[in-house]
C-alpha cells in the first residue's frame, strides 16, 4: 500500500513538472535583476517574478504563476488595465494569449526579448518589447499594437509598461514644483487604492511634476541600502504613472502616455508604438539606482556622454533685457577668464518696432534690435571667435507676443479656440505648427540665423 502511494505521489510530481515544462518561461535579465514571465494553462501571460537575479533553475521552477502581465480592459479582472481597445464592431473587451517570443542580442551587453500575444477572437496583435542593459541594470520596455480588422479600431489606453510587485509596504517618491521652485521631493506610503502621477499640459508636461518616480519596497528609501525601483518615460507630452494597490496588498505600476485626450484610431495593418519606459532596480538604495541611470544615459542616450562636457556663460542672470554690445563683450572676457567654453546670448536681442525690452512685446520679430546691437549678431560671433570661445544664442520661433509685427500681420497663425478670447501665458501665444506657412516661417528663422551667422555653435531653444 505504501509503495503504491509513493508511486502515485512520484507520478503526480513528475506529471506536474512535465506539464510545467510545456509552458514557456521567459527570463529577462541584467547582471543583478530578473524579470520573469510564464504562460498559464489558459494560454495567458503572467509576470511571475521581479527582483534579485535567480541563478538556479530550481528557484525559477518554484515561482508562483503571478499576475497577468499586460492586463486588458473588459474581462474578468477588476483593476486598472494596461490596454483598452474598442473593436470596429463596438466590443470594448480584449483577451490576449501568448503566441511566441524571440530573443536576440542588440549589441554587446544589450539583449532584447519580444513577446507576441494575440486575441483569439479578433485579429489584434500586441508585442511587448524588453531591452535589458546588462551592466547598467536597466530595462527598457515598449509596446507595439496592430490589427487586421476590416475597419479602424479605437485605442483608448496603451501602456508602455505594466509591472507587478508583492511586498509588505511600498513608499513612493515623486518630484513636483514650478518655475524657480523645481523638484520638491515627497515620499509617501502607498495603501489600498490608486495613486496617479500625471500631467495634461501637453508640450509643457514637465511644468508641475517630473516624469519619473522612485519606489522603495518594504521600507522608506535610503541612500545606500534597501530595494528601490526607479522609472521614467521617454516622452515629452502628457504622461501617466498609475500605482494601484489591490485587496491583497499587491501593487501594479502602469506607465505610459496619459489616456486623457489621447484616443487613437488605428488603421488595419498599421503599427502603433508606445514611448519607451525605462526602469532600474537597486538592492543597495536610491543612490545606486541613480548611478545606474547616469551610467546608462552617458553610454546609450547622450551624445558623447562619456566625453568632457562644454561649459557656458549665459548673460541672462547678469543683464536680463538690459544690455548692449559693450556689456556682452565684457561678459565674454569674464567667460574667458573663468575658462568657460561658450558664451550664450539669451532673450532680448531682437525686434525693432516693438523692441524686446521685456517679456510683453517683440517675441517672434527675429531681427536684431539696432539700439542694442548696431553691428548685429555677427559682431558678437566674431568677438567670441577672437577670444577663443564659442557663441550660442536663444530663440523661441514657435511663440509670439500679441504686441509684435508678426502678430499684426498674421493673427491667423496662432492657435486659438473659435468664439473664445485669447489666453496669454507670459504675455504670449503659440503659433500653429500644423499650418504649412508657419512651418516655413519657423524653418526660415533658424535657417536665416545659421546661414547669416555660420559661427553660431549652439541654440538654446
Question: Model-derived features: where do they sit?
Answer:
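An acidic- and aromatic-residue-enriched active-site/binding cleft used to recognize and process polar
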Residues: 40, 148, 158-160, 348-350, ...
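Short Pro-Gly-centered flexible turn/kink motifs
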Residues: 91-98, 264-283
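Terminal connector regions
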Residues: 279-310, 317
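Short acidic, Pro/Gly- and aromatic-enriched capping/linker segments at domain boundaries
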Residues: 21-25, 249-267
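Aromatic-lined carbohydrate-binding/catalytic grooves of carbohydrate-active enzymes
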Residues: 304-454, 458
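Polysaccharide-binding surfaces and accessory modules of carbohydrate-active proteins
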Residues: 22-36, 44-244, 260
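Bacterial Sec-dependent N-terminal signal peptides
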Residues: 1-23
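Hydrophobic beta-strand core residues of beta-sandwich domains
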Residues: 133, 266, 371-374
